[in-house]
From Swiss-Prot:
One Pfam family named in its UniProt record: Ribosomal_L14
GO cellular component, one term: cytosolic large ribosomal subunit
Keyword Transferase included in the entry's annotation: no
Assigned protein family: Belongs to the universal ribosomal protein uL14 family.
Positions of transmembrane segments: none
Matching InterPro entries: Ribosomal_uL14, Ribosomal_uL14_bac-type, Ribosomal_uL14_sf
Domain of life: Bacteria
Keywords: Ribonucleoprotein, Ribosomal protein, RNA-binding, rRNA-binding
This protein's name: Large ribosomal subunit protein uL14
A GO molecular-function annotation: large ribosomal subunit rRNA binding
UniProt function note: Binds to 23S rRNA. Forms part of two intersubunit bridges in the 70S ribosome.
Subunit structure, as described in the record: Part of the 50S ribosomal subunit. Forms a cluster with proteins L3 and L19. In the 70S ribosome, L14 and L19 interact and together make contacts with the 16S rRNA in bridges B5 and B8.
Length: 122
């Protein structure tokens, strides 16, 4: 569960390390984001040589959440941390690598490029 003002790790090599959520896309007065949701973030920590700088406003998709999420088959999925991947306006990732496991729910939301870059899909 990602709330407003949550500090989140970045799971790709786009150049940002940590971002802060300030808007959850997809509805009026929507305050909580979960797996596969698109959020607007401000970069809080970045690699010095990257094109993404501290303070930049970026769009990101949630790929891991620490709160358990119930799947349709009755099983639950949860991760050790909250993580996002930075995307552009078309929904394609800005980075060329994705680190760590990715939830299968991203396939249902048509983030297939992120799924193909991930080392493991759970």
């Amino acid at each position: 569960m990602i709330q407003l003002r949550s500090i989140i790790n970045v799971a790709d090599n786009s150049g940002a390390r940590k971002v802060q959520c300030f808007k959850v896309r997809g509805g009026h007065h929507r305050d909580i984001a979960t797996l596969g949701d698109v959020i607007m973030c401000s970069v809080r920590d970045a690699i010095p040589t990257s094109s993404i700088k501290k303070g930049d406003v970026v769009r990101a998709v949630v790929v891991r959440v620490a709160r358990e999420k119930r799947r349709k088959d009755g099983s639950y999925i949860r991760f050790d941390e909250n993580a996002v991947c930075i995307i552009n306006e078309n929904g394609e990732p800005k980075g060329t690598r994705v680190f760590g496991p990715i939830a299968r729910e991203l396939r249902d939301k048509n983030f297939l490029k992120i799924i193909s870059l991930a080392p493991e899909v759970i």
